[in-house]
């Protein structure tokens, strides 16, 4: 009998050659909110327009501090008529909830992490055909969120069709995992989903990169995760000023390389600095920060980073973890 233990890390491949794959997204978590004030409360907290969020849609969003810098990013959506939920990186959720609860003191709002749900990603060849054996209707670009008893499905269109399954009922997960005989199906860890997010240009702000960047630096405006027409929210004044005066000097990039020289055998991790040598190799200049990375099956590495826009797009750079400069790499940089 298949279970979550089947989702061990396997070779990571590009979306163009991805077979039908289920991925265990243990690095994400579902946060539920309920109460009579949830709409107004979240509208005053998140960068997106909660008041106009449709029941069949989700929205990219960011939660900022007073300086307009992202505490984290998330996908926010309705899970029923009375509850709103969002999905965010697991390792930031304690900090995130603690900050949000400070502003919920005088509101009828309850914020609860759901540790009992299972988040599964589905993508690759024949993914729609596979899911249609269980669900008559799948979410798409128009109806991005669909609910069934015990499960919610979200659709993501980039870099290829993929689905996030929010499974509330363990028996549904068991059924999905043990009714796959008609399909050649692979099981992988969240690292494959990470690779797809990097391809898609979907940012990942976790504990190590929390409160470092304005949302525009993570392309949240391009992803329609910022409403510039709504009322005030935390950090709104600075976020709006950056947009109005075109002051954003950073952007989200996809970095890829076939050469990776690292004596410590360490991949870049969230929060690592990206630096350049300057002035006869005596001075290190900080030019960016790693958000997430993965090593592909063919050996090259794929990195998501926020870089200064003034950075030269093809050059040799180094990674710095704490005080250790541990590797150099020749990069090809693709802006998303």
Curated annotation (Swiss-Prot):
Return the SUPFAM superfamilies for the record. Answer: Aminomethyltransferase beta-barrel domain (SSF101790), Folate-binding domain (SSF103025)
Tell me the residue numbers annotated for binding folate. 28, 193
Q: Which domain of life is it from?
A: Bacteria
Report the SS bond pairs.
none
Ordered alphabetically, the record's keywords are: Cytoplasm, Folate-binding, tRNA processing
Q: Which Pfam families match?
A: YgfZ_barrel
Q: Which GO terms describe its cellular component?
A: cytoplasm
| GO biological process assignments | iron-sulfur cluster assembly; RNA modification; tRNA processing
**InterPro entries on file:** GcvT/YgfZ_C (IPR029043), tRNA-modifying_YgfZ (IPR023758), YgfZ/GcvT (IPR045179), YgfZ/GcvT_CS (IPR017703), YgfZ_barrel (IPR048451)
Q: What HAMAP family does the database record attribute to this sequence?
A: tRNA_modifying_YgfZ
**Biological role:** Folate-binding protein involved in regulating the level of ATP-DnaA and in the modification of some tRNAs. It is probably a key factor in regulatory networks that act via tRNA modification, such as initiation of chromosomal replication.
Protein family membership:
Belongs to the tRNA-modifying YgfZ family.
Q: What is this protein called?
A: tRNA-modifying protein YgfZ
Organism from which the protein derives: Blochmanniella floridana
Q: Please name the taxonomic classification of the source.
A: Bacteria, Pseudomonadati, Pseudomonadota, Gammaproteobacteria, Enterobacterales
